[in-house]
């Protein structure tokens, strides 16, 4: 299996396949990852999501893809956290 695959989550299109295949599916908060280039079924529902082998891979993918995109009117202009470091932090 590849370490990372992208998909769009409208009605379970990331989370369900991940669950069926024993992978990690992650749907970030709407606007966290740019949706430029995505053909939406509904702007309010479609999210870019990732399918990965592990939570660590998902955190790394989010760290790389997250951030404000001025070309996406729904993109959130908020700082990107260090998601990989957050995994190592005590609970």
Task: State the predicted function of each range.
Residues 1-19, 51-55, 62:
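Active-site-proximal alpha-helical scaffold in enzymes
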Residues 21-25:
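Short, hinge-like loop/turn segments at secondary-structure boundaries
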Residues 27-91:
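A short helix-breaking turn/cap at a secondary-structure junction
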């Amino acid at each position: 299996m590849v370490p990372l695959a992208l998909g769009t989550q409208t009605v379970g299109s990331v989370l369900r396949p991940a669950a069926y295949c024993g992978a990690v599916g992650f749907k970030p908060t709407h606007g966290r990852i740019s949706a430029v280039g995505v053909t939406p079924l509904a702007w309010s529902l479609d999210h870019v999501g990732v399918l990965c082998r592990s939570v660590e891979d998902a955190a790394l993918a989010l760290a790389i893809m997250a951030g404000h995109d001025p070309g996406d009117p729904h993109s959130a202009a908020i700082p990107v956290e260090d998601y990989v470091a957050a995994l190592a932090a005590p609970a």
